[in-house]
């Protein structure tokens, strides 16, 4: 399936996949308002074998076919402080077991 991929200029690492270039008729108006002016990134021929860094091709294809669009959001931010605290706690627990 050929898809047009747009990036948001307002929201970093946020992408919108649609079936037809410049046809945003199936994208809800509130979403487009938050997304901002879409900036075309690429036209992709997506198959089930297509590899994405942050999405599964099957989910992208299904969403575009059923909803008319797929919205890829950035990953949640990593809380390095919490990870460090968890690591220290686990390390302390392991020392206490010995």
UniProtKB/Swiss-Prot annotation:
Descriptive protein name: YcgL domain-containing protein Ping_1076
Transmembrane segments annotated in the record for this chain: none
Pfam families attached to this UniProt entry: YcgL
PROSITE patterns membership: YCGL
The YcgL domain, residue ranges: 1-85
Record-linked PANTHER family: PROTEIN YCGL
Highest taxon of the lineage: Bacteria
Cited InterPro entries: YcgL-like_sf, YcgL_dom
Region (Disordered): 75-98
Signal peptide start and end residues: none
